[in-house]
Amino acid sequence: MNLPVKIRRDWHYYAFAIGLIFILNGVVGLLGFEAKGWQTYAVGLVTWVISFWLAGLIIRRRDEETENAQ
């Protein structure tokens, strides 16, 4: 299967972010926050944003110039 270069290079970033989404949704559920109506979409959007932001902070991508030099 031919995946795009970006996905082959950054698969661990996406996997980590999706794992964080599940964890944050579990934390929100354990805290007892009960969302109704449009709030469910807002909570989902916020968990996605926070998860990808944290994944970007934790996982740093190497510079492409460094990769090409090796």
Swiss-Prot record:
Keywords: Cell membrane, Membrane, Transmembrane, Transmembrane helix. It is found in: Cell membrane. It comes from the Bacteria. It is a multi-pass membrane protein. InterPro entries: Uncharacterised_YaiZ. The chain crosses the membrane at residues 13-33, 39-59. GO terms for cellular component: plasma membrane. This is Uncharacterized protein YaiZ.
